[in-house]
């Protein structure tokens, strides 16, 4: 009996050693409590690419929203096209949505404070009305929403509207000009425009030189035609100067515009080129003294002068006179000479010192000075 008992114990012991001595197969490990039981997979997954529509909508800038409507008869409305052709005499009414609307329209209407034009602001829209229209009213009409903070307003570029209106009038192919002869200055550093604008959208317009008589081609390189502006000289130079005119043809009719004198500008744009000169730098008591400030510049650029002089604090009476004229410097080059002269009579001790002249134009200002001594 003991033998069988011992034999049974030996068999149980060997069985336990077999169980505890087993090794886990490769790539296997016991799972930890709470571990994810989902088996890993080697399946490739393509990254999700957003649709083109989604990406474009995220990256694109906000589109400009047209806020302009044209009022038709019987209370009908329509969005105006980029260009409109209307008969002269018709009434035009434009409305733009917004509680604060800014307007732009042909300068002709603003220059003469024309009573035919009415601009009103209603609670929800701005309103522009033009009655008894003429061919001279041809041009761009535009509006925009104003974003205001107190008294400071700026244009909302995303909410605008515009239309260019041709007012066709019998016998008028060109937008009328206030004169029979005009001057166009050719600056080497900016475009020049011969303002031959027509009143008929379909009109064919050509540019001509008076002498020698020939057509000047608008080749798209040196000269282009813009129906809203006229003939544009992209890079003016001295060979372009001379007398030119435009010819328009439409509906079997033809018409010639006013003439334009093209003058080349010798002085480039920039702050005034200024010099100062005194009639004498040493003055005796009782004598008169004049100080001259001179600017050479572009023919169509105005210059403003200001003076600082020794007797200014004592309210010393002086005479200041400003003048300008055009001078021709050969080969058709034209320059504007602007001058300001300050004159002091009966020179006294308080008049001695620095005479300072400041000349200013749209590009900047220049200050020059000279000394006048008492002798």
Curated annotation (Swiss-Prot):
Glycan attachment sites: 132, 219
InterPro entries: Ig-like_dom, Ig-like_dom_sf, Ig-like_fold, Ig_sub, Ig_sub2, PDGFRL
Record's subcellular location: Secreted
Keyword set includes Disulfide bond: yes
Tissue specificity: Expressed in colon, lung and liver.
One cellular-component annotation, GO: extracellular region
Ig-like C2-type domain span: 62-159, 272-375
Signal peptide from the UniProt entry: 1-21
Disulfide bonds: 96-143, 293-357
Gene3D superfamilies on file: Immunoglobulins (2.60.40.10)
Keywords (A to Z) from UniProt: Disease variant, Disulfide bond, Glycoprotein, Immunoglobulin domain, Repeat, Secreted, Signal
Chain intervals for the UniProt region annotation (Disordered): 22-64
Single GO MF annotation: platelet-derived growth factor beta-receptor activity
Biased composition (Basic residues): 40-50
Glycoprotein as UniProt keyword: yes
Coarse class of the protein's main subcellular location: secreted
Disease: Colorectal cancer: A complex disease characterized by malignant lesions arising from the inner wall of the large intestine (the colon) and the rectum. Genetic alterations are often associated with progression from premalignant lesion (adenoma) to invasive adenocarcinoma. Risk factors for cancer of the colon and rectum include colon polyps, long-standing ulcerative colitis, and genetic family history.
Subunit structure: Forms a complex composed of PDGFRL, TNK2 and GRB2.
Protein name as it appears in the record: Platelet-derived growth factor receptor-like protein
Organism of provenance: Homo sapiens (Human)
């Amino acid at each position: 009996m003991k033998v069988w008992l011992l034999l049974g114990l030996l068999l149980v012991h060997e069985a336990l050693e077999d169980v505890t001595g087993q090794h886990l197969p490769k790539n296997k490990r016991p799972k930890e409590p709470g571990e994810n039981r989902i088996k890993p997979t080697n399946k490739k997954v393509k990254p999700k690419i957003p649709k083109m529509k989604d990406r474009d909508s995220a990256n694109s800038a906000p589109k400009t929203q047209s806020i302009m409507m044209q009022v038709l008869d019987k209370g009908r409305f329509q969005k105006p096209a980029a260009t409109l052709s209307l008969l002269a005499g018709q009434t035009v009414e434009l409305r733009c949505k917004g509680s604060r609307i800014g307007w732009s329209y042909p300068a002709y209407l603003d220059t003469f404070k024309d009573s035919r034009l009415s601009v009103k602001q209603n609670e929800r829209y701005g309103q522009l009305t033009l009655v008894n229209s003429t061919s001279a009213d041809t041009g761009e009409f535009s509006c925009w929403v104003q974003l205001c903070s107190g008294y400071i307003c700026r244009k909302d570029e995303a909410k605008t509207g515009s239309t260019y209106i041709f007012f066709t009038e019998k016998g008028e192919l060109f937008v009328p000009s206030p004169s029979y002869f005009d001057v166009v200055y050719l600056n080497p550093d900016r475009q020049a425009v011969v303002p031959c604008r027509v009143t008929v959208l379909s009109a064919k317009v050509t540019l001509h030189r008076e002498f020698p008589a020939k057509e000047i081609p608008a080749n798209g390189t040196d000269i282009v035609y813009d129906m809203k502006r006229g003939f544009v000289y992209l890079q003016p130079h001295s060979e372009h100067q001379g007398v030119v005119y435009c010819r328009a043809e439409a509906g079997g009719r033809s018409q010639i515009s006013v003439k334009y004198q093209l003058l080349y500008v010798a002085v480039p744009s920039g702050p005034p080129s200024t010099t100062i000169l005194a009639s004498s730098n040493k003055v005796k008591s009782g004598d008169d003294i004049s100080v001259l400030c001179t600017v050479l510049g572009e023919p169509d650029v105005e210059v403003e002068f200001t003076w600082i002089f020794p007797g200014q604090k004592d309210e010393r009476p002086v005479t200041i006179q400003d003048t300008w004229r055009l001078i021709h410097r050969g080969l058709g080059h034209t320059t504007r000479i602007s001058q300001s002269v300050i004159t002091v009579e009966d020179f006294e001790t308080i008049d001695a010192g620095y005479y300072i002249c400041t000349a200013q134009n749209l590009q900047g200002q220049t200050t020059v000075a000279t000394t006048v001594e008492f002798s």
